[in-house]
Amino acid sequence: MSRVGKSIIKLPAKVEVKADAEALTIKGPLGELKTPIYEGVSANVENGELVFTRKSEDQKTVALHGLVRSLAMNCVKGVTSGWEKNLEITGVGYRAQKRGKDLVMALGYSHEVVFPEPNGIKIEVADQLKIKVSGIDRQLVGQVAADIRSKRPPEPYKGKGIKYQNEYIRRKAGKTGKK
């Protein structure tokens, strides 16, 4: 039995769920998300609770049972409170700023790095060294944060670059001089 799949999702008062054979549509105060329901798994809304059941006990269906439930839970949390990822910039002369809908970063290259803000995502720059990526779709928020981080990932010697908040960067010792 999938322990994740069999747990029930309690729906907040402001959330509305429509389930059909192929997809789950979840509406909340922050927006609307759609998540797929895979073959062998069905969803039912009963008394303000979202319950997932599976039709067989084969390994693939058991795995998809937990996956569908997790994706639905991410959507419910997304439309009620949203998701966010925080990034930090470390390095002399490295900084970020918003210019219209674009995130413009100086990352030690000969040119500025311009990152356009995708639809459904809000990018904020608190001071020049902190970037906050937020939105209702957890997968999209994580992907956009990873794309921003990939513009200058942290290096192991001084830790310069863009890293997630609370990310640990393994440091390496520099060269030891000639003796």
Curated annotation (Swiss-Prot):
Give me any GO biological process, just one: cytoplasmic translation
Membrane-spanning residues? none
Reply yes or no: does the keyword Cytoplasm apply: no
| GO CC aspect terms | cytosolic large ribosomal subunit
Pfam name, any one: Ribosomal_L6
- The entry's keywords: Ribonucleoprotein, Ribosomal protein, RNA-binding, rRNA-binding
Q: Does the keyword Transcription apply?
A: no
State the source organism's domain of life: Bacteria
Which GO terms fall under molecular function for this chain's record?
rRNA binding; structural constituent of ribosome
PROSITE patterns with a match to the protein in the record: RIBOSOMAL_L6_1
Its function, per the record, reads: This protein binds to the 23S rRNA, and is important in its secondary structure. It is located near the subunit interface in the base of the L7/L12 stalk, and near the tRNA binding site of the peptidyltransferase center.
Q: What's the subunit arrangement here?
A: Part of the 50S ribosomal subunit.
Say which family it is in: Belongs to the universal ribosomal protein uL6 family.
Q: What is the protein named?
A: Large ribosomal subunit protein uL6
> What gene codes for this chain?
rplF
